Structure formats: structure tokens, C-alpha cells
């Protein structure tokens, strides 16, 4: 980017704005919207979306408009979830000018911010409006259909009652197993496994999604609630070190369990300073994210910044979370450990199973039932568009309070409100998958949505 060109950068969070302003070139001025400056108002009858100005945010809107007049470039860097999309769209409408761009924040390092400022795309507010209206249309017509439950309840029913892809299983004694690859099976299917005697197998440690981190933060007692865990993760993301102004971790709201190719290269160069290059995963084992994916996995920006070296700058809980993320990332980039025991199933050749809770567990055979962990649930619901990473912690706590689900040892089980609808699980799964695809349709009509809902 041309650092002499005056750029107006618009973000959601005042904390982000303060951190980023220190690291940006002097020619970049940052304004935080502090959430919604407008509230969405959807007219289902006319299929129109309006942005109704929040009177308490008048000063922010005024400043955005005034600064935009002087700026050579305007960049909106909000989340890629529906809330972030609405903020980007409403700001673009306020400015009523072409050439507004959108950027994606990957991390709060100086290099990360400069990279974001250079790698921006023209904001297509018409396309954004269509996508937003489609989501509002789907939710509006769903809520008016008396034959359908709450859309989130339907999503949970589809996860627990329909055939899905599983990577976690429980044996007869409640010991949690993991499979080397996902298996397509029914939720009540029994999978018989027996010891593998001919091949050596290894643990599978993948890079971290938001869902994985929140699961671990609650399990490790860094947080009492999942929403608290999400706030803790956000706090860690916004933390910069006093002695260097360096940020600690990458973007905290992501469904990815993979790194970009350039991140793998950076990690490799960093790790060489700590250990041997021979200890790193070979390329064929690396989880590589698509270059056009909005975000990659969560990881420490500098492996040379070890947990013990920053412990004095971090309070207890953020420090413990950083330590956990750091050590998990090291495991995910280095050669996997050999398993003492692994199990196979005749109907799924090439896939092996191993116990997660107790690696000394050994029996001649076992019967495994598919199960859904906290992180599995997040991944599944994100795929159907029901729940994005940014809302996962808060929503999970709400479902627990409502008695829709129970969670024990990270395994999620459905309760009566979900169980009572299991006979329609496949139908809900089909409807939700179809609607999620149609949400990107530029010519989606109410008639099309009604037809899908009635199928």
C-alpha cells in the first residue's frame, strides 16, 4: 500500500481501534463503530432491508462521514459473519460512494495490519445486501411456519438425529475415542473395532478453530462458562506486549483447522530457531487452508514468545489460555506421536481409532457409538449456517440454560426438546442444507423459500 495516502479504516471494536492505531502508518486513521450504528429493519412483505440510525451513535456516524470526505481510501474491516456484513453494508450506504473497500483482519501484528491494508477488495454493497436480505427472508418465513420448531432447535435435531460425519466415539465404558478420518454413519450405529497388529499409527493433532479453543478453555477451567471463554479468547487477541507492542495470537473467530501456505512457511522458519526442522510435519501431513478462506486457524504469532516469557505481562487466565494455545500449536506442526494401541474396523479400511482419555486403555475388541463433542457441534452448525464462531460461546450457554443439551467431559448429548423431534431430523437436515446454499442465491424468492420449508 501507499503509506502516504490518507486512509480511513473502519472497525467494530474501540479496543481493536486503539491497538491498531499504534501499529498503522501515520496516514491511516481508525474509527470504531462500537457495534451497530444502525439497527436492521427487514420488511418481509416488500423484501426490503433498511438501516435505522441509532440516535446514540450519531457522533460516530458524523465522524465517519466527515473523515471519508478527506480520505483517498476507505476500508471497512468488520467480521465476515452476518453482523459484520450488516455493519459494512450500512456504513457503505452512509458514504454513498464507489470505491469503498473491505479488508479482513488476520492478526494484530504490524506485518498483519500492513498486509490487510494492502490486500483489500472492492465492497460490493449490492451483493452484500442480497445476502443479508436472503438471511432475513429465510429466518422470517421459517419463524412463520407453524410446522417447524425454532431454527436453532431444528439445527440441533439435525446434528443429533440424522446421519452425519463423525470423528469421535464412545465405547461401552464411556471412554472417548477418536478416528483418523471422519466416518459417515447413523447416530445410533455400532462400530466394532479390534486391535491393529500390523501397522504403527499416530495421534492426530490439528490446528485450532474457535470451537476447539472454547471447548478446551471450559474443560481446563480457564472459564466457568463458554461465553466467558469466548471473551477470554477475544481479550487475548487484543492483548499486545508492553515491551514490544507485539500481538500474541491470530484472529480468534474462525472455523478453520488449517493454516495458509505462507503461515506454514513462517512457522517453519520460526520453529527452526527452537528445534530441528526434521521434527516438523512433512508437507503431505500439513493441514493447508484455501487461500480464499476468510480466516485460518488460531495460533501464536511468534513461537519465540514462549508462555513463561510473557507470564508477567498477562493475568492468570489469559496467560493459561496462551500457554495452552502455544503448546497445542507446537503439537499440531510437529511430527505426531506414536500410539501405544490403535484399533481398526473391517468396514472402514484405512481408518484407525484410538482412545483419547486414557492411552493405556487396551481390550481385545470394543463397540463404539458415534458422539458429538463441543467442537464437533460448532463445526457442524457452522456448515449449515445456523451458528457462526463469533456467537458460539454465548449460544451454547443459552442452550444449556434452556435444557436443550447437556455436556459432560466435552461430549454433548441432546435433551427432551431435541429428542422429541428426532423423527424429523433427516428432514430438518435437508431443509437447512438447502436453505444455506440458497442464501447465496442472487435471485432467491419467497416462493422458493416456502417451497423448501414445505418439502
At which residue positions do the language-model features occur?
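A generic secondary-structure signal for well-formed alpha-helical elements
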Residues: 95-99, 145, 221, 237-247, ...
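Intrinsically disordered, low-complexity regulatory segments
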Residues: 1-142, 155-157, 186-188, 199, ...
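Long, highly charged, low-complexity internal segments
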Residues: 22, 29, 38-55, 148-238, ...
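Accessory beta->alpha helical hairpin/"wing" motif in late/C-terminal subdomains of nucleic-acid enzymes
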Residues: 245-272, 394-429
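Leucine-rich, amphipathic alpha-helical/linker segments
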Residues: 273-301, 428-455
Amino acid at each position: 500500500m501507499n503509506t502516504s495516502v490518507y486512509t480511513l479504516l473502519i472497525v467494530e471494536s474501540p479496543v481493536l481501534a486503539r491497538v491498531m492505531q499504534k501499529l498503522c502508518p501515520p496516514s491511516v486513521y481508525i474509527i470504531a463503530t462500537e457495534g451497530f450504528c444502525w439497527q436492521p429493519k427487514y420488511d418481509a412483505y416488500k423484501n426490503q432491508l433498511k438501516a435505522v440510525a441509532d440516535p446514540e451513535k450519531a457522533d460516530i456516524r458524523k465522524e465517519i462521514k466527515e473523515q471519508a470526505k478527506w480520505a483517498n481510501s476507505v476500508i471497512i474491516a468488520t467480521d465476515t459473519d452476518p453482523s459484520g456484513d450488516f455493519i459494512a453494508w450500512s456504513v457503505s450506504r452512509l458514504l454513498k460512494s464507489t470505491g469503498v473497500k473491505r479488508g479482513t483482519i488476520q492478526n494484530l501484528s504490524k506485518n498483519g495490519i500492513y498486509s490487510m491494508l494492502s490486500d483489500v477488495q472492492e465492497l460490493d454493497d449490492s451483493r452484500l445486501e442480497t445476502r443479508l436480505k436472503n438471511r432475513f427472508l429465510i429466518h422470517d418465513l421459517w419463524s412463520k411456519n407453524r410446522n417447524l420448531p425454532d431454527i436453532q432447535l431444528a439445527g440441533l435435531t439435525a446434528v443429533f438425529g440424522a446421519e452425519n460425519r463423525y470423528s469421535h466415539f464412545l465405547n461401552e465404558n464411556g471412554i472417548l475415542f477418536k478416528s483418523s478420518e471422519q466416518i459417515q454413519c447413523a447416530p445410533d450405529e455400532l462400530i466394532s473395532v479390534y486391535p491393529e497388529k500390523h501397522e504403527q499409527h499416530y495421534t492426530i493433532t490439528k490446528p485450532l478453530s474457535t470451537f476447539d479453543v472454547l471447548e478446551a478453555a471450559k474443560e481446563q477451567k480457564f472459564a466457568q462458562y463458554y461465553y466467558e471463554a469466548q471473551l477470554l479468547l477475544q481479550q487475548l487477541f487484543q492483548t499486545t506486549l508492553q515491551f514490544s507492542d507485539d500481538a500474541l495470537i491470530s484472529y480468534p473467530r474462525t472455523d478453520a483447522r488449517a493454516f495458509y501456505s505462507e503461515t506454514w512457511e513462517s512457522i517453519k522458519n520460526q520453529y527452526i530457531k527452537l528445534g530441528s526442522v526434521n521434527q516438523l510435519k512433512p508437507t503431505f501431513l500439513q493441514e493447508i487452508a484455501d487461500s480464499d478462506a476468510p480466516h485460518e486457524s488460531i495460533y501464536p504469532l511468534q513461537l519465540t514468545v514462549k508462555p513463561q516469557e510473557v507470564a508477567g505481562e498477562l493475568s492468570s487466565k489469559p496467560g493459561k489460555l496462551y500457554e495452552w494455545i502455544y503448546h497445542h500449536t507446537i503439537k499440531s506442526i510437529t511430527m505426531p506421536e506414536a500410539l501405544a494401541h490403535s484399533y481398526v474396523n473391517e468396514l472402514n479400511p484405512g481408518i484407525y481409532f484410538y482412545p483419547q482419555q486414557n492411552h493405556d486403555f487396551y481390550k481385545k475388541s470394543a463397540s463404539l457409538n458415534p458422539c458429538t463433542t463441543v467442537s464437533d457441534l460448532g463445526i457442524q452448525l457452522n456448515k449449515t449456517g445456523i451458528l457462526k464462531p463469533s456467537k458460539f460461546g454465548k449460544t451454547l450457554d443459552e442452550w444449556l440454560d434452556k435444557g436443550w443439551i447437556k455436556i459432560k467431559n466435552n461430549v454433548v448429548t441432546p435433551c427432551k426438546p431435541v429428542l422429541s423431534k428426532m423423527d424429523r431430523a433427516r428432514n430438518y437436515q435437508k431443509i437447512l442444507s438447502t436453505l444455506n446454499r440458497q442464501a447465496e442465491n442472487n435471485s432467491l424468492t419467497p416462493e422458493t423459500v416456502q417451497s423448501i420449508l414445505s418439502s
